[in-house]
Amino acid sequence: MGKFLQLLSHPTELKAVIQLFGFRQPLHPGKRDVNDKELGRCYELLNLTSRSFAAVIEELHPELRDAVMIFYLVLRALDTIEDDMTIKSSIKIPLLREFDTKLNTKNWTFDGYGPNEKDRTVLVEFDKILNVYHRLKPQYQDIIKSITFKMGNGMADYILDEEFNVYGVATVEDYNLYCHYVAGLVGEGLTNLFVLANFGDKTLTENNFAKADSMGLFLQKTNIIRDYHEDLQDGRSFWPREIWSKYTENLQDFHKVKTPAKEFAGVSCINELVLNALGHVTDCLDYLSLVKDPSSFSFCAIPQVMAVATLAEVYNNPKVLHGVVKIRKGTTCRLILESRTLPGVVKIFKEYIQVINHKSSVRDPNYLKIGIKCGEIEQYCEMIYPNKQALPPSMKSLPENKFTKIVASRESIDLSVQRRIEPGNFNCNVVLFGIGALILSLIYFVLY
């Protein structure tokens, strides 16, 4: 009931919910051969482990849909082993380091997990995942195997790192490296898949996948900031000591010590972490501008717009120190609908960067730095899609920049997606108008 009342208090979000579930047409409906039991079971496992990821993966172009699904399940299996504290290190470390070799087999499974491990099914039925993996194009298999090797060894290194296990993340450099292993490598693998399928520009692989790495780091850092309280309850934290030590001697004190001074220090720390995360935004916008396939674009864009909206929610927000802070479900639906084209994504980023800037407090130690960073990002958004009305009368055309050719080359892609969007918008508006008129008629009939 509370969520329904929340939607009623935000009419645009209520409309977004209705439009998303009633009128949005997916680019590639997830149709599969009903007789392919093992492929079907893999998609069931995907839904069991993450319904949100399943929804976007199932709408991918058929060329990459199965490959991305298997990529996700393989990494989920790896993550399940790493997370399970009941597995002895003598078993876990070699298993993580050699997990990529299991992809050479066709019937490997694992039953040495703990009874409370929620995603253990992916290990019990890993042979079904292997069956579908071996049906993928060899190039796609190689990409999945390569990332599995890198991530498995990264996980093993962190388990053996006593300083990390005792004290957590030390420096910002360590913070970046940890996020790289957890999320940046996923971006690298996906980018290789996009480029190989000709769904993304080859320049996405340049500079050691720097832009793809930023995509992953932006998402992971946002989650780390948001999950402070939850991680604290689990006896861990990923906030880098180099940042939080400026504000407190003990990281737990942000939650435990309930004084105005400590709350201000905690919020100031949150804001510096947000500032750090914002350093990846321009790379993310660069990356998205170079993804050419509409379904792959949505797959990449949705998590990014959720992340920038979440950053705006956690910024300058003391609730992060004492509980879970999330964006509203209605906001999520609106962002999914509005992030289907590059102009839509740029508009969303600009919107939430302005929210962050307006939430800033002059008392914050990083007030000026945040203001400058927000200004830089807004200017970057303007560079991608300049405001023609803001041009001085003497200028007859927009000045060219590095985005001029990129935007021109993808204009037909975004326009074709926009043409698919418009009927859904129109039909939703017609239905809502009809419902509104009916309600008003009933009210008039009852009252008069």
UniProtKB/Swiss-Prot annotation:
SUPFAM superfamilies: Terpenoid synthases. Its cofactor is Mg(2+). Induction: Expression is induced by lovastatin and fluconazole and is repressed by amphotericin B and caspofungin. Expression is repressed during spider biofilm formation. It catalyses: 2 (2E,6E)-farnesyl diphosphate + NADPH + H(+) = squalene + 2 diphosphate + NADP(+); 2 (2E,6E)-farnesyl diphosphate + NADH + H(+) = squalene + 2 diphosphate + NAD(+). GO terms for cellular component: endoplasmic reticulum membrane. GO terms for biological process: ergosterol biosynthetic process; farnesyl diphosphate metabolic process; isoprenoid biosynthetic process via mevalonate. Keywords: Endoplasmic reticulum, Isoprene biosynthesis, Lipid biosynthesis, Lipid metabolism, Magnesium, Membrane, Microsome, Multifunctional enzyme, NADP, Steroid biosynthesis, Steroid metabolism, Sterol biosynthesis, Sterol metabolism, Transferase, Transmembrane, Transmembrane helix. Its EC number is 2.5.1.21. The chain crosses the membrane at residues 420-440. It is a single-pass membrane protein. Signal peptide: none annotated. Pathway: Terpene metabolism; lanosterol biosynthesis; lanosterol from farnesyl diphosphate: step 1/3. One of its GO terms (molecular function) is squalene synthase [NAD(P)H] activity. It is found in: Endoplasmic reticulum membrane; Microsome. Squalene synthase; part of the third module of ergosterol biosynthesis pathway that includes the late steps of the pathway. ERG9 produces squalene from 2 farnesyl pyrophosphate moieties. The third module or late pathway involves the ergosterol synthesis itself through consecutive reactions that mainly occur in the endoplasmic reticulum (ER) membrane. Firstly, the squalene synthase ERG9 catalyzes the condensation of 2 farnesyl pyrophosphate moieties to form squalene, which is the precursor of all steroids. Belongs to the phytoene/squalene synthase family. This is Squalene synthase ERG9. It comes from Candida albicans. The gene is ERG9.
